[in-house]
């Protein structure tokens, strides 16, 4: 897996990497959905999951920026929380192992690895696309991962074999009947709110679990419930880009 030395300093004027940054931000929802379900698994399926974010510090010759990876990720629909995985090269205002919080729109990449297969890694593939074959081999050996064709980036598990996994996570499809059965016996928990005002409906909407959201609504979940900052489940579905979830939560007239 990644070592502390595997840090890449990227010029912000690098157009392929800038495009990769944007793709990572637009598709982050798939990363969080996978991590959401990973936490429900009895046996972990992921080798690791990380998000790359930029860190800044004023230097003698101007601003210094290092793009580094964080893990132990949590996402509340607005902010990403994690722990810095890398040892900074030049920065002195942040340390490896330090807890960090960044707006989701600030990320520059995401990646998870399942059974040795990488998903995401947009900036990695952008940089690999500019390398020679020998350089790519050395790069992949440093990570301990075969990143394959730089032009092919997977977003979800078994995407090629099951493109429907883009729309709904396979674990969601597999457990929805049991979930409905549980709700039919006791749906009281749907009205619970955590210390920040999030309900179960908020969390499922952020993760893009349309089948779960639909079942919750049928069993009395209140789509008008707001977090302490005033966000509804619909707000989060729109912010994260889950249109199929937003369609379920739109008020009916």
Swiss-Prot record:
ANK repeat spans: 196-225, 229-252
SMART domains linked: ANK (SM00248)
Repeat is among the record's keywords: yes
Keywords of this entry: ANK repeat, Repeat
InterPro entries xref list: Ankyrin_rpt, Ankyrin_rpt-contain_sf, DUF2314
Pfam families: Ank_2, DUF2314
SUPFAM superfamilies, per the entry: Ankyrin repeat
Superkingdom per UniProt: Bacteria
Protein name: Putative ankyrin repeat protein NMB1133/NMB1171
């Amino acid at each position: 897996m990644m070592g502390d030395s595997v840090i890449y300093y990227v010029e912000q004027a690098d157009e392929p990497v800038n495009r990769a940054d944007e793709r990572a931000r637009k598709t982050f929802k798939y990363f969080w959905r996978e991590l959401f379900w990973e936490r429900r698994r009895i046996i972990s399926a992921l080798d690791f999951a990380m998000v790359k974010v930029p860190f800044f510090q004023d230097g003698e010759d101007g601003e210094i920026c290092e793009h580094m990876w964080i893990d132990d990720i949590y996402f509340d629909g607005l902010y990403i929380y994690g722990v810095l995985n890398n040892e900074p090269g030049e920065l002195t205002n942040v340390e490896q192992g330090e807890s960090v919080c960044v707006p989701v729109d600030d990320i520059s990449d995401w990646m998870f690895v399942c059974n040795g297969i990488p998903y995401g890694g947009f900036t990695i593939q952008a940089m690999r696309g500019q390398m020679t074959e020998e350089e790519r081999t050395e790069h992949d050996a440093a990570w301990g991962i075969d990143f394959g064709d730089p032009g092919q980036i997977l977003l979800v598990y078994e995407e090629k074999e099951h493109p429907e996994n883009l729309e709904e996570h396979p674990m969601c499809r597999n457990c929805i009947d049991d979930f409905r059965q549980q709700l039919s016996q006791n749906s009281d928990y749907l009205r619970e709110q955590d210390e920040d005002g999030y309900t179960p409906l908020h969390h499922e909407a952020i993760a893009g679990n349309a089948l779960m959201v639909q079942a919750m609504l049928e069993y009395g979940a209140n789509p008008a419930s707001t977090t302490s900052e005033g966000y509804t489940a619909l707000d989060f579905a729109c912010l994260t880009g889950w249109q199929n979830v937003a369609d379920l939560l739109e008020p009916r007239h």
